């Protein structure tokens, strides 16, 4: 998870970009922070998906084969 300070800085830069614009240094900082945020978000989403099992209305496991294989490989 991204630190509260980094999240606050992302929001601060977004507000400043809308109101008065960013300097080149601030724009680069914003891009780097956004990349880091997206990387953390994607990792969390991937971890969440690896804990998912899809069950149809009849109670059958219909989890996609590719996901099952990925889940098995993470266990070993």
Swiss-Prot record:
Its main location: cytoplasm. GO terms for cellular component: cytoplasm. Keywords: Cytoplasm. Gene3D superfamilies: Helix hairpin bin. The keyword Cytoplasm applies. Pfam families: DUF896 (PF05979). SUPFAM superfamilies: YnzC-like. It is found in: Cytoplasm. Residues 54-76 are annotated as: Disordered. It comes from the Bacteria. InterPro entries: DUF896 (IPR009242). Belongs to the UPF0291 family. PANTHER family: UPF0291 PROTEIN CBO2609/CLC_2481, UPF0291 PROTEIN YNZC. This is UPF0291 protein GWCH70_1239.
